[in-house]
Amino acid sequence: MFARQPLRFAQPLKQGFRKYSTEAPAKGKSSLAPIYISVGLAGLGVGLYRYSTASAETPVVDRPKVFTGGEQGWVDLKLSEIENLSHNTKRLRFEFADKEAVSGLQVASALLTKFKPAEGKPVIRPYTPVSDEDQPGYLDLVVKVYPNGPMSEHLHSMNVDQRLEFKGPIPKYPWETNKHKHICLIAGGTGITPMYQLARQIFKNPEDQTKVTLVFGNVSEEDILLKKELQELENTHPRRFKAFYVLDNPPKEWTGGKGYVTKELLKTVLPEPKEEDIKIFVCGPPGMYKAISGPKVSPKDQGELTGLLAELGYNKDQVYKF
């Protein structure tokens, strides 16, 4: 579901520039200059003292964490809100018992969900919340329903005030500020959720200058999840975040990519394998893994790198499969 042709970047926002005075200082000297300088430095010292004192007195909020991992069992959460995002996708909000608590997740990590059907064994599936890790009081899941997908069908059938069991966090790829100079996110369908978690963390941290390129494939335009949030990131950080949207069944007026992924597309939009300090993340349906990077052997075994990324010359250490 990726294009066979290069895609266009969104146009960078126009930037305003502040004009500073270039007027030369007066030639004459003043005997009051040392006094003004002393007073200025004294004022600066008082200001710095007040600022440092206020900063020191500002309490650091250490919020309780809902999910602590380890020996912690399943945590029961109540569904408080339901939002229909498309014909087959919902945003589900689950509230914490403690309104001041945060999830306890780190970037990048996920949660396990569990429910027990009337007959058969419990169904357990991982999901990556799309709400901020520091958000107190609740977490949000974006869930697309799949035919014969027992967990997604169950989640779509839930009503407000019903409850679901969660467990975690399940660590994935631990992110640190400026861990890589440039990362590339290749996502399909709901595979965007861990990608968005990672991108959001990068761009909310003013010290993180990582560049991000996203290739996001879907069947139709209405299947593009988190489009508003992704466009906001691109509009806010046009020099560091570039997004490519590719549709298998595009509308007539669609100006983005069409069709399926090709080697030519990836060669056009991704940094070259020889570039230093890059990382490519892949997340999507099984067919995407097979074509792009090869599948994982298990949750803890990334498996060998095959597919188009291997053909383009990338090595195993440059690719991570969610």
From Swiss-Prot:
Gene3D superfamilies: Nucleotide-binding domain of ferredoxin-NADP reductase (FNR) module, Translation factors. It is a single-pass membrane protein. Pfam families: FAD_binding_6, NAD_binding_1. It is an enzyme of class 1 (oxidoreductase). It is found in: Mitochondrion outer membrane. The chain crosses the membrane at residues 32-48. It catalyses: 2 Fe(III)-[cytochrome b5] + NADH = 2 Fe(II)-[cytochrome b5] + NAD(+) + H(+). Its cofactor is FAD. It comes from the Eukaryota. CDD domains: cyt_b5_reduct_like (cd06183). The keyword NAD applies. Residues 72-176 form the FAD-binding FR-type domain. Its EC number is 1.6.2.2. Keywords: FAD, Flavoprotein, Membrane, Mitochondrion, Mitochondrion outer membrane, NAD, Oxidoreductase, Transmembrane, Transmembrane helix. FAD binds at residues 179-214. GO terms for cellular component: mitochondrial outer membrane. GO terms for biological process: ergosterol biosynthetic process. Belongs to the flavoprotein pyridine nucleotide cytochrome reductase family. PANTHER family: NADH-CYTOCHROME B5 REDUCTASE, NADH-CYTOCHROME B5 REDUCTASE 2. This is NADH-cytochrome b5 reductase 2. It comes from Aspergillus clavatus (strain ATCC 1007 / CBS 513.65 / DSM 816 / NCTC 3887 / NRRL 1 / QM 1276 / 107).
